[in-house]
Regions:
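Short aromatic/basic micro-patch
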Residues: 21-22, 53, 121-122, 142, ...
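A generic secondary-structure signal
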Residues: 30-34, 62, 76, 150
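Conserved N-terminal catalytic core of the sugar/cofactor nucleotidyltransferase
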Residues: 1-51, 56-58
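Conserved core of the sugar-phosphate nucleotidyltransferase
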Residues: 53-126
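Conserved beta-strand termini and adjacent loop/short-helix elements that scaffold enzyme active sites
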Residues: 6-8, 73, 104, 160-162
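Left-handed beta-helix
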Residues: 126, 134-221
Length: 221
């Protein structure tokens, strides 16, 4: 168990020899050796540009109860309430009453409430190994196109709805916006003050900022 941070571009043994990956699926092919030997029954795959405080235990229980091959963690958003429009690379997920995914497509400027892929997912390790081997054999490179869309209705793909605070950073403007959001105590509590889910940050014992008599500071943490 636990978190394993794998160095990027470990692609030895992938098709074509040493190469730099450009997609999620190519990156997974590059860490095939780790997947083979990690010993876990299920693996959580996540991007690193999301802001949220999530307990994966409930999502994992849901994944196991559904006997899912892949469980995609989704978030319900209302496009009419967003400060920034959704990126075209965001995936929209539709699922039935049992949580089974029935449609998966790129965002196409739809308005209203949408279930979007948070780019966090739980995958059965044996299934992931089969995906990696098939991708190597057939030259697949897109997780969305070659795995999810190709196998919808054939394999067990489920959604798990995350209902906590969520945002993602895909630009400098969004980075600034998300930081400014943390000045709002109600938003800050949703990230840093969730019961039994503390956020541990790195201690930086550096010299404090010096404020002179003519400094003007407002709305600062």
């Amino acid at each position: 168990g636990g978190i394993r941070i794998l160095p990027p571009f470990i692609t030895s043994g992938t098709r074509g020899g040493e190469k730099l990956y450009t997609t999620r699926l190519e990156a997974l092919v590059g860490v095939k050796n780790f997947v083979e030997n990690c010993g876990a029954d299920h693996i959580i795959i996540s991007d690193c540009n999301m802001i949220c405080n999530i307990d994966f235990n409930d999502a994992l229980d849901n994944h196991i109860a559904n006997d899912a091959d892949i469980t995609i963690i989704t978030k319900l958003v209302n496009t009419n309430e967003l400060k920034f429009p959704l990126d075209k690379y965001i995936k929209v997920v539709n699922y039935n009453g049992n949580g089974e995914i029935v449609d998966y497509a790129s965002y196409d400027r739809q308005n209203g409430e949408l279930h979007i892929n948070t780019n966090m997912m739980i995958v059965k390790r044996s299934y992931l190994l089969d995906l990696i081997n098939e991708s190597e054999a057939r030259g697949y490179d897109s997780f969305s196109r070659d795995v999810i869309r190709r196998n919808l209705g054939k394999h067990r793909f489920f959604a798990y709805e995350y209902d906590g605070y969520f945002n993602y950073i895909d630009s400098m403007q969004k980075y600034f916006f998300c930081n400014m959001k943390m000045l709002d105590s109600s938003k800050r509590k949703l990230v840093f003050h969730v019961k039994n889910r503390p956020v541990y940050t790195k201690v930086r014992n550096s010299a404090p900022t010096r404020y002179t008599s003519d400094a003007k500071v407002t709305n600062s943490i």
